[in-house]
Amino acid sequence: MGSTPTVVLVHGAFADASGYAEVIRELQSQAVEVRAPMNPLRGLAFDADAIARYTTTIEGPIVLVGHSYGGAVISQAAPVVNDVIALVFLSAFALDKGESCASIQEPFPPSLLASTSVPSPYDAPGAPHGPDLFIKIADFHQTFCADLPAQVAAPMAVSQRPLSAAALTEKATVAGWKNLPAWYLLSGQDNAIAPDCQRFMAGRMKAHVEPVSEGSHAAFIARPDIAAGLILKAIKTT
């Protein structure tokens, strides 16, 4: 490998890039260049295009990292990102062509998120159709980040960024992971994406798996050392 890659961190639903703060600090302490753009959360094709366009500002090789819905976005974006060399999924969706974030979960027991997310009473701005989705504030801690202290989860709950419902049912048109090495942080106590669903997606990618047995959907926030370590492995072995 030539020049050191830049790591692009793509957040998922009900969150923003600030969730990566400690991961960023860990990576920067190892002299890794990092970027953490906003994911619009409007629809899979739209969001992937936004991330792909953002990467045109970066010179040299790129490692794309996605959490949750952000995993679907990086896999959709990867084929049109110049010089992407690896994908890292943090408790994330890794879709095949023709799958959606909703359909990939159908063979598995419903997650807690299925009963704690609620639609907005308005159409999602900038989305093709349907409402935005939020997690009920009272249920956010248990659903999204049960391994974080309540005082940390509370501001996350009230500042969550909604995901358009359309984004969950929009089908992937490509599977970027099929042509790239992949790493996967698997959260064993995830209440948003069933751990068995994560195992299935990681297994078919033949990803290098880092299990966090007690990890919530936000395990990368609770254990930034593990998340950053996985990203560093992707950098060093690609």
Q: Over which residues does each language-model region extend?
A:
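Short beta-strand/loop motif that positions the catalytic acidic residue
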Residues: 184-186
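Conserved loop-alpha-helix segment in the C-terminal half of the alpha/beta-hydrolase fold
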Residues: 188-221, 233-234
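Flexible "cap/lid" loop of the alpha/beta hydrolase fold
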Residues: 83-128, 164-167, 201
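Active-site nucleophile elbow and catalytic-triad environment of alpha/beta-hydrolase enzymes
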Residues: 155-176
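Short, proline-enriched alpha-helix->beta-strand connector loops that line the catalytic pocket
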Residues: 5, 177-182, 205-208
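Gly/Ala-rich beta-loop-alpha elbow adjacent to hydrolase catalytic centers
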Residues: 65-70, 74
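Active-site catalytic motif of lipid deacylating hydrolases and related acyltransferases
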Residues: 2-60
